[in-house]
Amino acid sequence: MNSVYNTYEKGMNRINQHIALILLQSIFCRQYNLIGINSTQALTIPIKQYHQKSRKMSTSKDIEVETSATSPAFANTSGDGEIPSFNGDEKAKASDFANYFCSYAQLYHQKQMLADHNRMAAYHSAIMGNADVFKDKVVMDVGTGSGILAVWAAQAGARKVYAIEYTDMAKHARQVMKANGVEDIVTVIQGAVEEIVLPIEEDGLECDDPEHPERVVDIFISEWMGYFLLRESMLDSLIRARDKFMKPATGLMFPSHTTMYVAPVQDEEERRMNCNEYAASMSDWQDFQETTKQVYGVEMEILKSDFDREQKDYYMWSSRWRELPAASVLSERKMIKVLDMMTCTIEDSKGVDMGDEASKFEFAVDGDREQGPISGIAGWFTADFKSRTDEVGKDSAPKLLDPTILSTGPEMGYTHWGQQVFYFASGIPLMQGQTTNITGSLEMTRTKENARLYNCRIKYASSRNSNNDGKQLMKSAPKEQVYMIP
């Protein structure tokens, strides 16, 4: 009987970390009133980042994991959903707050962004370096958070700044305005930007367009970007605000353009750790299953395949936040999407269409120069602060004399966005004297369950050619995998 209980104790110890994580998620969700979200959505909050960063490096042998074209948990989840414009729908507001806005009401979250030097330096340079275009202008900061961008706009000479914030962080933003002596210039408005009414007459503002009397804003500033640019789908709200409040011929967007990039990377320790933790979780299940049968007489094997799917989706088919060293990038980056913030539509913000030519990639990695294998594909973005390039405003809008670029690529070091890495189940080896080619495409779509989250479908194949005569030595079968960006 002792051996049975020893087996039980061993099995329970090995699954304790999984139970602890679930309990921790539950506590966090209750603390911040995250009612009605599922375990996958719970992992999108900082607990998941803490779990990823605190995992110990595994030294066990690399585990081969069977790949599938579409992971069952994410099958048929690509949707065309839009972020609700609310229009008084209190139920929609409550759901979106629980699933998205709530964490932005916490100062710890704001501090994480404010401590991002690359982020701060880029916005500060873009605003203060172009103070001439802010002088005497009307500015709107969408998603002001702590209000720092609104403060800079006022300091740069803006006549009026409207700082829009949906959460109770608006109360802190008002304190920040007063502490920095700009409370007479900056008006903090708490609410969804889709629903707010600007105090235009009260502030003495006039519009030259009688058909659109609310178009009084000269400059929009916003830090709306999420992981791999589009995650969180805040761009929808910014586009609606732009179309409603901006002067179309002379208005400016900060940032003005954004670009998404991908590149092959080497990050084998993390890739192998994901594989090994998946294998360990399945070993935990086996112990649990046997113990439950021996001690309690209940057969649980019927659930093994479902548990396997859950674990594989989490460990293998979810992208990972990484702060990659520049040396891990094995080839030139490939641009897969560009957004002009003056002309992009909500349809543009929904993702990356595999039918677009830009979504296709081709990389060549020289085995003589690089150490293999290729671990996966990484994605990141840049945000440009520059003059308008669209036909409507390129001649009539003010010119930015000091353009700025914010990059979240590995060459920049730490940003809170990091890079999203989509790991292959097995690394692609590099061989001396040979060039390894990867060709494929990437599709990014919103999930049906939550329009603020995205899935990425990556199709790829590899081949190797001799560096001497160019002869093809190997060609793999095409592979396809769907990843969630948590």
Question: Language-model features: where?
Answer:
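Class I SAM-binding transferase module
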Residues: 58-142, 147-442, 447-486
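Leucine-biased recognition of intrinsically disordered, low-complexity hydrophobic segments
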Residues: 21-24, 34, 43
